[in-house]
Amino acid sequence: LYNAAYMKLFVFDTETTGFVEREGPLEVQPYIVQFSGILLELQEDKTLKEIDRIDAFVKPPISIPFGASQVHGIYDKDVIDKKPIQDQMDTFLAYLNGADIVVGHNIEYDESVMNYELQRLGRKGDYNPQKTLCTMKSCVDFCALP
């Protein structure tokens, strides 16, 4: 699969209202405030060609906590006139589910947040990537991290 010409990779990241609470109820889980990614296509010569990109801000149903804003630089004023998640989820899923491989750094976090948002929308199970790759996990040995 990794050598297939014209394979599509979607490299993405989310910014959110906070951290995942592993044991917490759905209401306390973070909301997406930004969804960004680049759709790439592997060429026959093993280079990657950019096909499309997305950088979408999302208006969450709660105020963005100050601590989260200090991390990613997105404040309530930046998303006040943006579309809510329910108006953008189909677009996000088209990128995620349409790629052969979805790539992210600490992708488990981004996947968790996507799934929480889908649960809130009554769409549990709509995120179905063919394959995922976590750059954080794949670099642990390379960087000699504990």
Task: Report each predicted region and the residues it spans.
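Metal-dependent phosphoesterase core characteristic of DEDDh/y 3'-5' exonuclease domains
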Residues: Y2-K8, V28-I74, L93-P146
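Serine-esterase "nucleophile elbow" of acetyl-processing enzymes
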Residues: V11
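Short acidic, Gly/Ser-rich segments with clustered Asp/Glu that frequently serve as metal-coordination loops
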Residues: T14-E23
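Surface-exposed cleft-lining segments at the edges of enzyme active sites
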Residues: D76-D78
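Glycine-rich, highly charged phosphate/nucleotide-binding loops
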Residues: I80-D90
